[in-house]
Amino acid sequence: MKSLLPIIALVLFVFGPARAQNPEGVWEGEIQDPKRPTVINVDFKTRRVSFSGTAPTTITQPALPSNDNRVRFQVANGAQTLKFAARQDGTRLTGEMDTGSRTIPFYLELLPSLPKPVGRAEAWQQDIDVVISRFLRYDRSYTAARREATRARLQALRAKVDRMSDQAITVELARAVALSGNAHTRLYLMRNRTEVRRVPIRVWWFGRELRIVSAATEYANLIGCRVTGIGRWNLPSAFSMVRNIKAGNASWQRYMSAYFLTSPDLLFGAGVLPNPERLPLTVSCGGRTRRVTVNPLPLRRSSTPVEAWWDLAPAYPHVDGLKPALAVEKAPPYLRHPDRNYWVEYLDAPAIVYLQYNRAQEMSSEPMADFIRRVTRTLDEHSIKGLIVDVRFNTGGDAGVGTPLVEALAARSKGLPVVVLTGRATFSAGITHAAQWKQFANASIIGEPAGDGLDLWSEGGNLLLPNSGLTVHYANGFHAYSVKDYPAFKPYFSDLNVATLVPDRVVEVSWSNYAAGRDPVLEAALARIRKSS
């Protein structure tokens, strides 16, 4: 949701009087802030340091040796200097970091140097060992029982990698990580990053129907078709076989399945397909059922996030030139601006302000402070009967960006009905803002259930696996948004007091709604405000 340590600008290492040897090799540990630890990785030989898996910074100053096992180094971060002081005891450094206003304990341990793997099996085993020895140490979302179950499953996987395909190993590794039950704890495969192949079609759940909402030119005749089977499996069976490749509730599983069900690599790894080089589908189009085969695109590994909901928006510029099911001119308001993190519109007839917040991230074209001024000006210029806040597609980012918006508008909307629209892609900071509106503006909730619960582990960082190049994300900051108390998880990273985010009225867009350019969720919100005013 938000990184605690900003970008590092300069690191200075200072050691005491010259006699003893400097620490050598790569060291890793935690700055032990009780709200959210920060993993620090230091290579004393190459003089590089990184925090929470972010890009390393080059240390430009040479280290000086010490004769009393003390190690001191400084991190210049803008106007702030983080001062580290530690004592070395063999392969462990223990000390404190001084921020200028507080001191926080930290430790570093020497990481073992991995030999070059002999063969594919050993390469995977080294990656699994990193997950066991380092990832499980840093992720705080596991209960003791779940941590041991994950460790056991990883050990079992380690013992049989020589008999498994790369795709099957990847899926099993993801499932082991997902035993945490926490949706932020995951192996990156799709969405945040792209590590597997996809076919040039995109799908979306409309109720129980999985429809093809966009496709490449050669598969354009499949647009609008309903998928009823994958490989030899009916759709419910195929869906069940890709569930829990990532942890998460039923809504989040539906959202993530829009990715997984279009990846022959993951479908093969999960046992849905016998061959990852083609995706056989059973589709129903215009009352006629037929079998088709879709071929995967070449793998393009990327660390750029890709949101499945973009496939619903005809104006979104698809990289692969996919043709949308919906014409641009038919798109309802919630699908008109997929390129904007936030935007607002005054709906004149019902005198309602509709605000869509798609991404918890500042826009350079309109900083949040400017946006808040524009929205409050709209509220001041009109006799408003209600406010609708749409976070159906807000999968997160930095909750600190949108919090001032909630605070400003909640104060301005006192006495007005406020309705928040949620959906399967309301996640992470999106849930934070839905909960804030519920608590501070007594908002009603309409739409689909959100993609996670009120209480969750987030924050954290990334660990790169040395051979596969895959990345695991650990979570270590607890967000307590419900009325339930968690003494063992205090101090909370973030705290609210909300009874529930279950929608007051569950409304979902059907395929016929979508094809007609209708938004029944917004319609239900407008009706609720009209009834209240």
Predicted segments, located by residue:
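Flexible, low-complexity junctional segments that flank or bridge functional domains
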Residues: 20, 45, 99-104, 109-386, ...
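Central antiparallel beta-sheet cores of small beta-barrel/beta-sandwich binding domains
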Residues: 21-89, 94-106
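Short, isolated positions in well-ordered beta-strands
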Residues: 56, 104, 211, 235, ...
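Short, surface-exposed linear segments at secondary-structure transitions and domain or protein termini
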Residues: 49-50, 67-71, 91-95, 113-118, ...
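Bacterial N-terminal signal peptides
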Residues: 6-14
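Conserved acidic, small-residue-rich alpha-beta core segments centered on
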Residues: 381-388, 392-530
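Positively charged n-region of N-terminal signal peptides that target proteins for export
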Residues: 1-4
